[in-house]
Amino acid sequence: MAALKGYGLCSMDSALQFPCPKLFNSYKRRSSKWVSPKAAVVPNFHLPMRSLEVKNRTNTDDIKALRVITAIKTPYLPDGRFDLEAYDDLVNIQIQNGAEGVIVGGTTGEGQLMSWDEHIMLIGHTVNCFGGSIKVIGNTGSNSTREAIHATEQGFAVGMHAALHINPYYGKTSIEGLIAHFQSVLHMGPTIIYNVPGRTGQDIPPRAIFKLSQNPNLAGVKECVGNKRVEEYTENGVVVWSGNDDECHDSRWDYGATGVISVTSNLVPGLMRKLMFEGRNSSLNSKLLPLMAWLFHEPNPIGINTALAQLGVSRPVFRLPYVPLPLSKRLEFVKLVKEIGREHFVGEKDVQALDDDDFILIGRY
């Protein structure tokens, strides 16, 4: 993601005056790790408030209580910019159908394809429009600790209720490094740690989570390893959300998960709420499993992007490298919608297969 521009804070002519750090004093060692005076972070003056201020204070227990959190999709205009009208409609539908939180700019929301300016803007927009009705959890994680610190400060500055943090990927670190990375951001506010080894290439082991759980700001873990891991956490008092839609029913009712952070709820939020709130429902779960399998036939968010376009909820615009599912899979989705019932899905238009030529692929935006 694009680096954020820094500014000299010690200029006498600056409109915002900050004290110059005493460099020699700040280098005193109280332990084996040196901590900079401001965590090497400076405010971005184009943001609505300084990144060191906090707009909302949310109790971590409020985050721990959430059962249905939607990893919200980010729709696009034909030129690749955010389609905020479609985005607002989608978030409104989530609220109306009982979703309690949204992950903004996560994997499903394609935060990995956003600049940090886009990312923080979308978090702030979501807070300003919907923050009184739904918990806004900003994905401000990064494989760079410096970027994670900076983005998380900005996310809390524009009002997000909690942060989602992934472990450093590609340039993997040691378990001790994982712990130090998360400790660098945990003090800022309520935090969900996201464990998805299939994407990061590294599992976050329970011993790391148990160490981090000593911090009261750890709301819990979005866990994608499986239900045995879910059970291990719940038996040890760690809140956990299933990160696998196809396992979330059993995670909730058999293994003690608090709920789910879901992709499928973009499409059927009311049914996902029913699955998490109304007790064991094997019949409904079985009904939804084929849809969940379809959504993850290719890596997320390819399936959800294709489905929302077919439902007419978002434009058929893809930021590369994502491309739509082929026609054969789109025809399968039409059949799935009819089997489950169009009334359970978001939007009001008839589901369509769409032609290949209907899709717009954007590489420069």
UniProtKB/Swiss-Prot annotation:
It holds the Pfam family DHDPS. Its EC number is 4.3.3.7. It comes from the Eukaryota. The record marks 107, 170 as: Part of a proton relay during catalysis. Catalyzes the condensation of (S)-aspartate-beta-semialdehyde [(S)-ASA] and pyruvate to 4-hydroxy-tetrahydrodipicolinate (HTPA). HAMAP family: DapA. This is 4-hydroxy-tetrahydrodipicolinate synthase 2, chloroplastic. It comes from Arabidopsis thaliana. The lineage of its organism: Eukaryota, Viridiplantae, Streptophyta, Embryophyta, Tracheophyta.
